[in-house]
Amino acid sequence: MRKFNLFIAFVCAAIPLVGCRSTSPKPTEQDTIAIYQTVIKQIYQSDDTFGGTLEKPILYIVRATNDATGDPSLPRSSSVVLSETVQQNITNALSNLPTTIIWVDSFDQVSIDPNTGVVDDKGVIITLGNIQYENNDRALLSANIYVANLAAGGKTYVLEKKDGVWVITGTTGVEWIS
């Protein structure tokens, strides 16, 4: 009977702990800026669907997130608008790129040639997803680039924080290109 009482006491003590695992980590503002600017830079420099050779004098970045941008089949979080502070800090972090960064509210806000589907003024449009943390040092971020109707691509990037710096270590899931 004593063992049974001990067992019951253990179960009663453990019940409140069920489901009390920590929630998924939330990015700090600095992590948010670092992750987004790392992926934008990767798209600008090499993942532009032209092997990094495309001149991109204007980089339009959609300020509202869209998780379907990399892998449309994955579950989606609600869209959020990146804060002015985050946008400005991302722009500052990318100031060494030879492009003009323009933040837009939506894809439809960018002028596109109706006959060719090409973004006006040789620009490109980047759409970003929400940062999905797997733990404090590993995150996923969906993103895509649009140049024209048959020149676009998207994927989900895997990032890891190494020695305090967020780096892309690979991709996961569907990668698409048109």
Go through the PLM ranges and name each one.
Residues 20-140, 144-152, 174-178:
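Flexible low-complexity loop/turn motifs enriched in small/helix-breaking residues
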Residues 154-177:
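Short beta-strand edge/turn micro-motifs at domain boundaries
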Residues 1-8:
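Bacterial N-terminal signal peptides that target proteins for export
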